[in-house]
Amino acid sequence: MELTPREKDKLLIFTAALLAERRKARGVKLNYPESIAYITATIMEGARDGKTVAELMGEGRTLLKRQDVMEGVPEMIHEVQVEATFPDGTKLVTVHDPIV
């Protein structure tokens, strides 16, 4: 199977997000890379489902709370930018202060 670098990146993000999702479900606090992957994958999947950029920007702020992540992680993540594939093309989704 031949994959482009972009496709490989998407698979890596999805794998990290799956791990983060399982850890979150067990009550394990997420670290920085897991938090980024969790938010990014949710945005990417929402785009594929046909949600709008505005919907995803709002949803991105509701995914993680301070109690879901390790100490200091919310202060490290000021924004998450995702180039997501929507039914009508690729768009940049920016989520400001995603962990409340």
From Swiss-Prot:
CDD domains according to UniProt: Urease_gamma
This enzyme's EC code(s): 3.5.1.5
Subcellular location: Cytoplasm
InterPro entries cross-referenced by the UniProt entry: Urease_gamma, Urease_gamma/gamma-beta_su, Urease_gamma_sf, Urease_subunit
Biological source species: Alcanivorax borkumensis (strain ATCC 700651 / DSM 11573 / NCIMB 13689 / SK2)
Stated name of the protein: Urease subunit gamma
HAMAP family for this protein: Urease_gamma
Assembly notes: Heterotrimer of UreA (gamma), UreB (beta) and UreC (alpha) subunits. Three heterotrimers associate to form the active enzyme.
One GO process term, biological-process aspect: urea catabolic process
Keyword list, A-Z: Cytoplasm, Hydrolase
